[in-house]
Amino acid sequence: MTVARNRVVFGRRIIDLPLARRQLMKIMLPTEQALSMSFLTADALDRAEAGSQDAAALLRILTPTLKFRATRDARKVCGDALEMRGGIGYIEEFATARLLRDAHLGSIWEGTSNVVALDVMRAIRREGALDALEPTLEAMLPKDAFGEA
């Protein structure tokens, strides 16, 4: 955001350009999603370590889901952030170029999307993780979120 507020192109700040604002939102939304899911997963971990079986089952489905989504989105977010910064985002004096490289490594280290999908299926079939996820989502979402009366 600092770059968008301060960098001037064609006589206007980047943040004042409608297409740039749209791109910023496309950076911010998945970032906030990953942060929110990280907190939800951390809470499940705390409760699982305190002995909650439901939290342990929830943790089994949240962990691979978070790994998949956050590492996949990180590549796009970092690429868009580098683009937003322009050429200065590419040079090594700023973290953006390193973050982009690290984002690609994240999905490699955490396993391919197919392996992560198999882990989710294992959690559902063997550990009842879906039964733990459903009430968690119901508590977080409005009653009519899925068009039900």
Task: Give residue spans per PLM region.
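Flavin-dependent oxidoreductase catalytic core characteristic
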Residues: 1-149
